[in-house]
């Protein structure tokens, strides 16, 4: 799968097809651009897409040719910083905040909670200075993904 390119874009009226790929719910544009990949149920997934103004169309998923994340300028900076964390390594919310020129580790956590491309933008590698921190998809999953990377099973 192509690596994620973190870039801004307007999703209103974006036509997407929804399906499952590698155990994740995915949304792919008709031109083959993966715009959302989450470990979530399809009903929640479709609601999120529609709230962004996407039009969900029927049909088979096209081949994924590109990956693009959509978010605010700040979110994009945070997600880009996450992509620089190597598999099996972690960084603290505070370290990411410093990297992106922000004083608030909490703001970084909020940006990570909006990550639309789970694993491809590896927000699970960002931890609290005092422990694992939060994770939109649950701490059990975060710990498993980190351990799999440390064990060389993912990456």
Predicted regions and their residues:
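Major-groove DNA-recognition helix of helix-turn-helix-type DNA-binding domains
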Residues: 111-120
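Short Lys/Arg-enriched helix C-cap and helix-to-coil transition segments
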Residues: 119-128
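Residue-level signal for inorganic ion chemistry
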Residues: 82, 96, 123-124, 145
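Helix-turn-helix DNA-binding helix
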Residues: 107-108
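Generic, ordered loop/turn and secondary-structure boundary motif
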Residues: 12, 68, 75, 127, ...
């Amino acid at each position: 799968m192509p690596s994620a390119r973190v870039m801004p874009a307007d999703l209103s009226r974006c036509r997407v097809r929804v399906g499952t790929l590698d155990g994740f719910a995915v949304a792919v544009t008709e031109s083959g651009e993966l715009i959302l990949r989450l470990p979530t149920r399809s009903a929640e997934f479709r609601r999120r897409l529609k709230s962004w103004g996407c039009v969900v169309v029927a049909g088979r998923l096209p081949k994924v040719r590109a990956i693009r994340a959509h978010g605010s300028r700040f979110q994009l900076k945070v997600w880009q910083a996450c992509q620089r964390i190597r598999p099996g390594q972690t960084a603290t919310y505070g370290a990411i905040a410093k990297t992106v020129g922000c004083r608030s580790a909490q703001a970084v956590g909020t940006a990570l909670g909006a990550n639309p491309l789970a694993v491809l933008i590896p927000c699970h590698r960002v931890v609290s200075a005092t422990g694992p921190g939060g994770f939109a998809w649950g701490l059990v999953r975060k710990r498993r993904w980190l351990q799999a990377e440390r064990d060389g099973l993912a990456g």
